[in-house]
Regions:
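Non-transmembrane "mature" sequence context
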Residues: 1-128
Length: 128
């Protein structure tokens, strides 16, 4: 992993705790689309994430943490490779995640475990 990759990962982590949930939701929706964002967040439809992107309330810390993790992963991959690769990364089967897609891990695992696992998968992507 190059220095610039480490910088991108560090920026993603810092921004995930500094940027508001509204801005995180807007960034993710703009980067990968509301359908993929909603699926990665474990939401039933796009209305909820679109509401968050426009300042709507997020009910519960689990949703906030899931959004934070999705933002961190999306930011890192998008900044390094662009939005199309970020979307493909979230959708695609990943050997670092037991051949599960990162969006599935983010939606179904505890937010802390999902964040750790998907960031490790991003690091593997950057190292290749």
């Amino acid at each position: 992993m190059s220095v610039s990759d480490e910088v991108v990962l560090e920026q993603a982590q810092k921004l995930s705790v500094q940027v508001s949930s509204e801005e995180q939701a807007r960034y993710v929706v703009d980067a990968v689309g509301s359908r993929l964002a909603a699926a990665a967040l474990g939401l039933r439809d796009t209305r909820t994430v679109n509401s968050w992107a426009h300042g709507g309330p997020i009910k519960g810390p689990l949703h906030e943490h899931r959004l934070q993790a999705l933002f961190r992963v999306t930011y890192a991959v998008k900044e390094r490779y662009g939005p199309a690769v970020a979307a493909a990364f979230l959708r695609g089967s990943n050997p670092a995640l037991g051949n599960r897609a990162p969006m599935t891990v983010l939606a179904n695992e505890s937010p802390a475990d999902a964040e750790q696992a998907t960031i490790a998968a991003v690091e593997t992507l950057f190292a290749s």
